[in-house]
Amino acid sequence: MADKEFDFVAFDACLMGSVEIADCMEGRAGYVIASPELEPQDGYDYSWMTALGDSLPSDMEWGEAVGRSMVDAYDAYYASGTAPVAMSLMDMKEYPAFHEVFHQYVDGIPQELREELYRELGKDRMKMLAFGSRQAGGSPELVDVLEFLDACQSVYPDESALQTLKEGMGKLVTDQWAKGYPGNPSGLTIYLPSGSNPYLSEDLETYDTTGFCSAYRQLTDGYAAYLARESGVEWGNINAHKDGTVEISIAPEDVSDVTGAYLAVFCPVGDDGNYYLLCTDSDVDIGVDGTLRAAPENSYMGMKGQVLCLIETMNLDAYTEYMAPVLYNGELCTMRIGFDEEHEDGQVLSVTPAGQTSEAAKQIYELKEGDRVTPLYLVEHMEDVEEEPVDGAKDGAKDEAKDGAKDEAKDEAKNEAKD
């Protein structure tokens, strides 16, 4: 690498708008342009290159001029879609100051508070803006930097440090554009381990090689160890009430070990003990007495009269997001659906291939008239549940069986899909 840094470095790739990437590019680029989200299949709109032929504004460096052109072109190209998309421009001369305060804050979290912090991170996970692909039973492992810091504040409040970090973030992310999110992203993501990741230990070994903030890597190691800890919680029987609510009890002393719970609603299929999963819902009240209480929905979203399998991936105060496994024009995909006041019946945000290849990760489809959609269902085999048709308080939906749609569902889905 030459002593002189690049004027700018741009990543026409998915999920590169992270604080870890910023750390890697310190001293190597004056400006970094990257997306914190999955990029649609078309990637960049290269009309931004017109900035290279324009005269440089008197108050702007080349890296900044090109970066702003990239953000504007991305905005114009993807403004009409519904899929969440984002692009950020980082002024790298601001990174050292941001990292210094970030390191000091994370390093200063007392050891005696870390167990409580790990619990809070688990509880707040579904409330954080997350980025990347969503799979059944899993959580994206990239979250908004400022939302992670807000979660830390609930355990280790330091308003002065938080304000300094927010100001530093505003200088570091000098320009950005985002759409399709329930809130306003900060422009940068950060890695936060998920207990649903079967390759967590291997991923952490890789993460340690990035050289990112040593204080944060120590925190993620501790959080991962917490996630991997065997649960000793004994779950009681499920009780269904006439008002529709269901309850399950645990020992009061075990309440602090439960960071979150799901109500999972199943529908019986035939007489062989198989059940289709209809939805998961994290709106579960966890009482200090050890009682977990939830109420199933009265109705569930469907298309052409066929109910979808809705697996919750985000649950904010005024917004809930789900993924639904489907066959989209014959391809195994995940449909992303959001609910808010404006879209009480749900809005299909995007459809993405379920494959794990880099090619699949870059493809984002938008549901359009004429598409063929076949709902798919996760299947659970349960014995002796005739008197308890509703199961709940699960850590998440299992994804061992992605198919199982009824033949009539396939026939229904051959009709035109709704927008």
What feature does the model see in each segment?
Residues 1-394, 398, 418-419:
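Terminal, contiguous helix-loop blocks that mediate binding/assembly
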Residues 389, 400-401, 405-417:
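Intrinsic-disorder/low-complexity detector
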